[in-house]
Amino acid sequence: MKIIAVIPARYASTRFPAKLMQDLGGKTVILRTYEAAVSTKLFDDVFVVTDSDLIFDEIVSNGGKAIMSIKEHESGSDRIAEAVANLDVDIVVNVQGDEPFTEAGPLEQVLSVFKNDPDKKIDLASLMREITNEDEINNPNNVKVVVDQSQFALYFSRSVIPYPREKDAGVRYFQHIGIYAFRKQALLDFYSLPMKSLEASEKLEQLRYLEFGKRIKMVETTHVGIGIDTAEDLERARAMLRDI
């Protein structure tokens, strides 16, 4: 089974423009993310796929592998699908470009779904972690997910789901961790589907998959991703790097 990681890297980030090219301890954010993915030794290959000459040159000039894509993509997974269409690969892992502290543990967890699925009944897997802090639960930047008894996703939302009308119902809240692992054909199928109202409303690409009746297997983790969405996040990442 050939497994690759692909890191979608769009230059014009809405909340923090050019964040992937920001300096983080002497290297750019995107280069650190690429090197972190390579260092896990879980993948047969690692690529950055980007619409930016700057990002492409940053990766290639430092010995990495990059693929240019068109600019007009609805999501990172769409960008990845374009890049891997002609690659000989079985599993494609979407690693977020703004996670320079990517570790092997959570990636191994999501890949375990496919290694324990000999009949190939699961096409897409992702991660979630339990959250209990009210601020985290109510933060629209923390995407919540609810699952069925078999740990397949029922819905993702920036809103609080489920709504806590009954405070003593014993509900657990889960934050979606944005690492996806696709079988290649499932990724190409995703790419062929048009955006519908749920994805457009929430701006969550995974809702496209659910809206067309597909299933996403969720794996619970304790991993806390260190994503860089704001200038404040970047400063925290710099402080964290100094402490390593």
UniProtKB/Swiss-Prot annotation:
Highest classification ranks of the organism: Bacteria, Pseudomonadati, Bacteroidota, Flavobacteriia, Flavobacteriales
Q: Where in the cell is it found?
A: Cytoplasm
This protein is called 3-deoxy-manno-octulosonate cytidylyltransferase
EC class (word): transferase
- Is the keyword DNA-binding assigned to this protein? no
Cross-referenced Pfam families, in alphabetical order?
CTP_transf_3 (PF02348)
| Species assigned in the record | Flavobacterium johnsoniae (strain ATCC 17061 / DSM 2064 / JCM 8514 / BCRC 14874 / CCUG 350202 / NBRC 14942 / NCIMB 11054 / UW101) (Cytophaga johnsonae)
What is the superkingdom listed in this entry's lineage?
Bacteria
Name the predominant localization: cytoplasm
A Gene Ontology molecular function term for this protein is: 3-deoxy-manno-octulosonate cytidylyltransferase activity
| Record's catalysed reaction(s) | 3-deoxy-alpha-D-manno-oct-2-ulosonate + CTP = CMP-3-deoxy-beta-D-manno-octulosonate + diphosphate
**Which family does this protein fall into?**
Belongs to the KdsB family.
Q: Which HAMAP family does the record cross-reference, listed alphabetically?
A: KdsB (MF_00057)
Q: Which UniProt keywords apply?
A: Cytoplasm, Lipopolysaccharide biosynthesis, Nucleotidyltransferase, Transferase
